C-alpha cells in the first residue's frame, strides 16, 4: 500500500475525454437520504477480525457482505461473512450469518437452520447458481480454506467444497466472482488471492519505530488469482495456467467482470495492492491476454503501481462503453477510468470531484448505482484505514473515515453529496465492504455496509422528494447460465439508452443482488428493453411500464411482472 503523495499530486492534471456525453440528468428533487434501518431490521452482527495485539495482516481486510434471494421469494436476504479467533487465542465462537427477509422491513437469523454456522477466517463472498438448479449458491473466501455452499432449495445449504474439487487449496483469498468465461452455459469461478502469508512467517513492521504496526503487502510475496472451470458435474478444475491468468506477483483485492471491448466475451479486471492492476481480455478460446498496460489502467500517470482495493465497472455516461472505478490507498485518490473505445482508458478522476474528495481517504468497497433513479449511475465508496495508529505519523489521515457518495451530474462530472445523506450514513467508520439491493421492494436501491471489527449497517434509501421511477429486470437463463450472469441489458426511453451487464463480483469482498435496476426519471414507461444473453440469444420487449420488476426468460421474453410493493 504505497504511501507516496507524489502519485496523487502528479495525477491532479486536467484530462479531457472527447467521448463524454453532453446530456445531463435533471435537477435533483431533493437531497440524498439513507436512514439507518439496522436496528429496526433486527440485524445484530459484529465482525470478529481476530485481533488480539499481534497485528496479523488478515485482520485488516474483512468482512464481506452479500444479498442473496436464497429461497426464491423475490425478496433479497442477507449473508454476512465473519472471521474467527486465531488458534491458541480463543475468546468467542463466531460464524457467518444468514438473515431471512420477512417482507416487512425485518429479518430473522436463520444461520443455524440453514447449516451455515461454520467457523472460518472468512473474508469475501460471491453469489451464483453454479449448477443451474434454480437456487443461488454461496462461495465464501477465507484465509485458509475457502468454502462452497450448495443451496439445497429447502432453506438449507451443504458444504460441498471437497466434493467440488475445491478442497485442499489453502490460500489468502479475498474477492471472488462467478463468470461464464467460455460461454458454455455454466458458471465458472475466479478467485482473488492477496499475498503469501502465515502467522509463522509474520514480519515485524513499525510506523513510528516504537511499536508494531500492520505490515503492508510490499513485505510479502504475491499470489496468483485462480480460475476454476465448471465441469458440469458439480466439480471444478483449476485452469489458471492454461487460461493465461497465472501471475504470482499479483496481490489482488478486487475483481470485476466486464466486456470492455464489446465483443461479447467477458473480460476480467483485477485491482492489485502495490502491484500493477491487470485487465485480462477474453480471447474467446479459453485463454486471456493481459491488456492493462496498453489500456492505461495498470499504473498511475507517473508510472507507479497504486494500492488498488475495490473495483466496479459501468457505462456511467451512456457512451456505450464500460468504464472502470478503482479505490486506492490514502494519498492516492480514486481512479475513474473512462473507456475511450479502441481499448484505451483515461483517468477522469482528477477533473471531477471524485478525485479531489478522495485524496486523503482509503477506499475499499465501491460501486456504481443510481440512488436517485434519474437514469445516471452514481458512485458510492466506503472508506477506512488499516491501522488504528495512523494519525501518529500522518495527522491528516484518519483511521475511521466517512464514505463518499457522488451524484452523477452528467458530462463526466460528479458532486459529493455525502453530507446530505444523513448523519448516520455520513458517520466515520472503519469501512470495508458494501453491497446494494432493493430490500423493501419499492424500486429503490438500499445499502448494506460493513465495518472491520464492528457492526454492519443497513441503510434504507429515502431520497427526499424523489418522484423518479424505475424498472427492474430479473433474468432466467435457459441456454445461458440460470442467473443470466454476463447478459447485457439495454433500456431505452425518450431520454436515451442505458446499458448494464448482469455481473457477479465487483465492489470489495461483496455481492450485490442479481437484479438490474434502471432509473427512468419522470418517465412512466420505457420504450424498449433488449437482452443479449451469453448464448447469443437476443430477446426484446416493447413498451414496458416502470414501477415493476419484470422477469425475462431466455428465448421466451417476459414471463412475469410484479409491481413494487406487492
Which residues does each predicted region cover?
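Hydrophobic beta-strand segments that make up the repeating blades of beta-propeller
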Residues: 75-82, 133-142, 189-193, 263, ...
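Repeat-based blade/solenoid architectures
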Residues: 43-64, 92, 114-126, 166-177, ...
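Beta-propeller blade repeat segments, especially FG-GAP/WD-type strand-to-loop junctions
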Residues: 22-35, 89-110, 145-159, 203-206, ...
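Short, conserved, GDST-rich strand-edge loop motifs in beta-rich repeat architectures
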Residues: 81-93, 193-220, 381-398
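Bacterial N-terminal signal peptides
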Residues: 7-17
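Beta-propeller blade termini
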Residues: 62-72, 100, 121-135, 148-150, ...
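Asp-box/WD-like beta-propeller blade repeats and closely related beta-sheet repeat scaffolds
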Residues: 110-130, 135, 140-181, 191-218, ...
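Gly/Ser/Thr/Pro-enriched helix-cap/hinge segments flanking short amphipathic alpha-helices
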Residues: 23-26, 30-33, 51, 353-356, ...
Amino acid at each position: 500500500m504505497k504511501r507516496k503523495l507524489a502519485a496523487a499530486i502528479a495525477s491532479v492534471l486536467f484530462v479531457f475525454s472527447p467521448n463524454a456525453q453532453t446530456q445531463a440528468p435533471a435537477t435533483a428533487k431533493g437531497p440524498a437520504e439513507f436512514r439507518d434501518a439496522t436496528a429496526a431490521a433486527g440485524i445484530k452482527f459484529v465482525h470478529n477480525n481476530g485481533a488480539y495485539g499481534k497485528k496479523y495482516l488478515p485482520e485488516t481486510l474483512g468482512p464481506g457482505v452479500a444479498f442473496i434471494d436464497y429461497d426464491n421469494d423475490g425478496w433479497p436476504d442477507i449473508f454476512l461473512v465473519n472471521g474467527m479467533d486465531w488458534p491458541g487465542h480463543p475468546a468467542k465462537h463466531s460464524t457467518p450469518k444468514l438473515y431471512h427477509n420477512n417482507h416487512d422491513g425485518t429479518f430473522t437469523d436463520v444461520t443455524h437452520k440453514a447449516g451455515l454456522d461454520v467457523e472460518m477466517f472468512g473474508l469475501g463472498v460471491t453469489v451464483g447458481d453454479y449448477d443451474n438448479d434454480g437456487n443461488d449458491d454461496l462461495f465464501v473466501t477465507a484465509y485458509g480454506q475457502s468454502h462452497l455452499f450448495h443451496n439445497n432449495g429447502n432453506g438449507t445449504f451443504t458444504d460441498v467444497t471437497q466434493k467440488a474439487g475445491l478442497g485442499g487449496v489453502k490460500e489468502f483469498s479475498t474477492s471472488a466472482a462467478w463468470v461464464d468465461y467460455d460461454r458454455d452455459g455454466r458458471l465458472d469461478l475466479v478467485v482473488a488471492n492477496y499475498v503469501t502469508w502465515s502467522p509463522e512467517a509474520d514480519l515485524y513492521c513499525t510506523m513510528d519505530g516504537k511499536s508494531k504496526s500492520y505490515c503492508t503487502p510490499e513485505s510479502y510475496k504475491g499470489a496468483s488469482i485462480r480460475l476454476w472451470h465448471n465441469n458440469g458435474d458439480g466439480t471444478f478444475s483449476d485452469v489458471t495456467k492454461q487460461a493465461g491468468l497465472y501471475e504470482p506477483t499479483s496481490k489482488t483485492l478486487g475483481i470485476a467482470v466486464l466486456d470492455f471491448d464489446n465483443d461479447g466475451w467477458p473480460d476480467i479486471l483485477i485491482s492489485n495492492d502495490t502491484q500493477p492492476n491487470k485487465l485480462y481480455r477474453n480471447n474467446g478460446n479459453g485463454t486471456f491476454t493481459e491488456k492493462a498496460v496498453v489500456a492505461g489502467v495498470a499504473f498511475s500517470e507517473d508510472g507507479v503501481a497504486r494500492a488498488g482495493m475495490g473495483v466496479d465497472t459501468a457505462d456511467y455516461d451512456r457512451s456505450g462503453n464500460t468504464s472502470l472505478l478503482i479505490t486506492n490507498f490514502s494519498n492516492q485518490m480514486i481512479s475513474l477510468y473512462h473507456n475511450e473505445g479502441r481499448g484505451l482508458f483515461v483517468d477522469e478522476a482528477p477533473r471531477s470531484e471524485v478525485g479531489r474528495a478522495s485524496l486523503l481517504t482509503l477506499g475499499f468497497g465501491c460501486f456504481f448505482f443510481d440512488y436517485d433513479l434519474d437514469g445516471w449511475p452514481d458512485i458510492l465508496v466506503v472508506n477506512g484505514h488499516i491501522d488504528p495508529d495512523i494519525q501518529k505519523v500522518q495527522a491528516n489521515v484518519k483511521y475511521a473515515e466517512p464514505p463518499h457518495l457522488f451524484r452523477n451530474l452528467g458530462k463526466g462530472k460528479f458532486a459529493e453529496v455525502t453530507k446530505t445523506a444523513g448523519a448516520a450514513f455520513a458517520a466515520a467508520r472503519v469501512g470495508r465492504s458494501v453491497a446494494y439491493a432493493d430490500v423493501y421492494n419499492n424500486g429503490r436501491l438500499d445499502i448494506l455496509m460493513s465495518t472491520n471489527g464492528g457492526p454492519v449497517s443497513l441503510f434504507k434509501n429515502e431520497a427526499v422528494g424523489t418522484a423518479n421511477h424505475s424498472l427492474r429486470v430479473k433474468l432466467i437463463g435457459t441456454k445461458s447460465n440460470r442467473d443470466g450472469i454476463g447478459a447485457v441489458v439495454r433500456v431505452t426511453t425518450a431520454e436515451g439508452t442505458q446499458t448494464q451487464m448482469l455481473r457477479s463480483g465487483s465492489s470489495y469482498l461483496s455481492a450485490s443482488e442479481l437484479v438490474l435496476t434502471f432509473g427512468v426519471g419522470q418517465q412512466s414507461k420505457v420504450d424498449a428493453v433488449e437482452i443479449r444473453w451469453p448464448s447469443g440469444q437476443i430477446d426484446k420487449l416493447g413498451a414496458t411500464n416502470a414501477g415493476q420488476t419484470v422477469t425475462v426468460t431466455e428465448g421466451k421474453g417476459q414471463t412475469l411482472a410484479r409491481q413494487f410493493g406487492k
